[in-house]
């Protein structure tokens, strides 16, 4: 049973991961053999075992240090599954139930630990090519793992607005997609444009702008910040837990 936090409305920490691409031979996969639909098993490659060790280091060492042992919410910001896409040949299985089973094995310990601290688990839908039309397979995974639904009873939502730290705390907007660039010299351009656009839209409709925006999709981490009404605003693009594919 999840422990109720000291203040159910005040969570000071938001941990965001994305782009696990479970079901890909270069995606995240637990080291324990995973049962497939036909009764066979898949065993993680040497590369996947190395990636898994980094995943464990992140959750066992970095997260407790960064959150100072306080409750935290977890957001999976899209593309938890690899899907069947772009004529690729790197899938462990083209059966989505197999891919969902792998993602469940990856995320369930994370979700259980999050809820045990008093936090909640949220899921944002990713790319149609990976998670199905309307994010159908990511919706199934999120419901299976007990994600907190939105007002439409969607367990995997298109975006998430989250205030961190209670009343007066920073407002965060999370969405999977963001523009990309083929040039390292312009890698920050789309991210800066996304942050700027969020301020323009907020002003246009007389709404509070986000202090932070979080995006994923590009598989490369970058953070951009600028001076703002509250002193500081930032845009963060999360890295992937998948190796480079052919």
Language-model features, listed with the residues they occupy:
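Divalent metal-coordination and catalytic microenvironments
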Residues: 19, 79, 103, 126, ...
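An acidic, phosphate/nucleotide-engaging active-site surface
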Residues: 132-189
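Active-site neighborhood of divalent metal-dependent phosphoester bond hydrolases
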Residues: 52-53, 81-155
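Structural motif
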Residues: 12-14, 71-74, 120, 170-172, ...
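Conserved beta-sheet core of the metallophosphoesterase superfamily
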Residues: 167-246
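A structural motif corresponding to the C-terminal end of an alpha-helix
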Residues: 61-72, 105-121, 207-209
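N-terminal active-site segment of His-dependent metallophosphoesterases
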Residues: 1-98
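Beta-strand-turn-beta hairpins that frame and shape the catalytic cleft
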Residues: 4-15, 161-173, 228-233
């Amino acid at each position: 049973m999840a422990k109720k936090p000291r203040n159910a409305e005040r969570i000071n920490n938001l941990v965001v991961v994305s782009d696990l691409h479970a079901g890909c031979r270069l995606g995240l996969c637990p080291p324990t053999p995973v049962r497939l639909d036909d009764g066979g098993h898949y065993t993680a490659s040497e590369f996947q075992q190395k990636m898994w060790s980094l995943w464990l280091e992140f959750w066992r060492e970095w997260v407790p240090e960064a959150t100072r042992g306080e409750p935290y919410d977890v957001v999976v910001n899209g593309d938890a599954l690899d899907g069947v896409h772009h004529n690729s040949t790197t899938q462990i299985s083209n059966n989505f139930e197999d891919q969902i089973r792998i993602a469940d094995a990856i995320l369930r310990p994370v979700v259980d630990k999050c809820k045990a601290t008093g936090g909640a688990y949220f899921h944002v839908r990713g790319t149609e090519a990976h998670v199905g039309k309307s994010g159908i397979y990511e919706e199934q995974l999120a419901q299976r793992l007990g994600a907190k639904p939105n007002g439409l009873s969607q367990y995997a939502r298109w975006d998430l607005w989250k205030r961190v730290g209670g009343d007066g705390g920073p407002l965060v907007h999370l969405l999977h997609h963001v523009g990309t660039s083929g040039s390292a010299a312009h890698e920050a351009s789309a991210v800066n444009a996304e942050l700027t656009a969020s301020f323009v839209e907020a002003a246009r409709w007389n709404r509070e702008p986000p202090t932070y925006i979080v995006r994923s999709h590009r598989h490369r981490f970058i953070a951009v910040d600028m001076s703002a009404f509250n002193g500081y605003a930032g845009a963060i693009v999360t890295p992937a837990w998948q190796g480079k594919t052919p």
